[in-house]
Amino acid sequence: MIEFSGRLGALKYPFFRRYWLGSFASVGATQLQVMALGWLLFELTESTLMLGYLGAAASIPTLAMTLFGGALADSIDKRKLMLGTSFLMTLLLAWLAVLDYLEIVTPWHIIVIAAAISFITGFDWPARTAIMPSLIERDEMFSAVALSAIVWQSSRMIVPALGGLILVVADTWVAFVLCTAGFFSMFLVMLSMNLKLPGLSSQGSPLEKVAEGVRFIWHEPTFLILTILSFAAMGFGFAYIQLMPAFSAILSLDESGYGFLISATGFGSVAGTLLIGDFQRSKNLGRLMLATALASCFFLYGFTVMTSILKHSDLAFAICIGCVFAASALNSMFMIMALTVLQLRVPEELRGRVLGIHGMCYSFGPLGGLAAGALAGYVTTSGAIAVLASCYVALIAFIALRYSVIRNLSGQTT
């Protein structure tokens, strides 16, 4: 029998292990869906603005519903909630696959289905995050957060490259069929788990429960600032991913090159996740978080310079791969450190709402893409990303200088 310890310690718990393996299927489906939707839409419209609209459709419903999704996750059985969300996303992606296969799909089909999936994600993400501590012991939280991050990051590393090959040898409808299978796999995993997770929240209306979670974050400086920084990390630091089809055109890349460029972000994130285990217990955890966030911005600047100056060259492509790799590694390190601090400090009865609010930050990548897409119409695609990176730098500098509660965070007391 395999014994798990250290960074893999959380895998010794059977329910977490099952949840983790199921997450590979559903998260892989999510990554493939994002890639295929963007490629299909750009193929139909050749418009960066439409990519921005797709980003808005993929983020705004999640932002609107996550607060209520967190309240629901605190009130009912989280496993049953995940059963429902997984099944609904399975149906939506199956519908999109049929539309695409029949060649009757339109840009607005893509936008509407992306918005519907985003709406459901507003309920799925809080449950997915809040259920995790129930599957492990507290002392394995660092391991569980890192392993969960590896699911997302390895999917970003592997799936786009495979997706690019799928687009070369088949079509986008094949990608949507695989996405359907991925979400259905997670549905089957949750169905197989004999686990009861009743809600713990107090009585009250949904709005009152949401307000309770918001008040907690507002009055706890550590939670408030780390949540703001997480939103900025995704909205400013990852906005470029939404515009990758446009950057691929700038670099004269085909489908496989597009896939490998996105995969570089996944490789970087996995590298950051593997490195973070050596720093989680650092007495300078707060300073380390700020430093990794700041350093990621300078690699974003490098990416924008290469796509502005060299453009159609193998050298530009190689340097861009290196820049997005490093930026993703550093941003991943920050996000894992921030989420672990929150997971360990949040009261159990507020977990769904507080982590749901934090989880809204993951929708800010596409929303940042909307802002970048709009800015690109006035400057350039590269210039738009540089502007967002500068906003991120300014925020990090302000927090580093103004808030000692973050600078002085220690992993030894978390």
What are these regions (language model features)?
Residues I2-P61, F216-T265:
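Helix-loop boundary and gating motifs at the non-cytosolic
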Residues F15, L49, D139-E140, W173, ...:
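Cytosolic histidine kinase catalytic core of two-component systems
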Residues R18-V34, A58-A71, D77-L92, H109-V168, ...:
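Substrate-agnostic recognition of the 12-TM MFS/MFS-like secondary transporter fold
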Residues G38-L44, A97-L102, I158-L178, I250-L251, ...:
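Transmembrane alpha-helix termini and helix-breaking/packing motifs in multi-pass membrane transporters
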Residues L54, A64-F68, S75, L81, ...:
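C-terminal transmembrane bundle of multi-pass solute transporters/carriers
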Residues P107-A114, S118, S143-S202, S263, ...:
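Hydrophobic alpha-helical transmembrane segments
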Residues E140, L191-R215, L409-T413:
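Flexible cytoplasmic inter-helical loops of multi-pass small-molecule transporters
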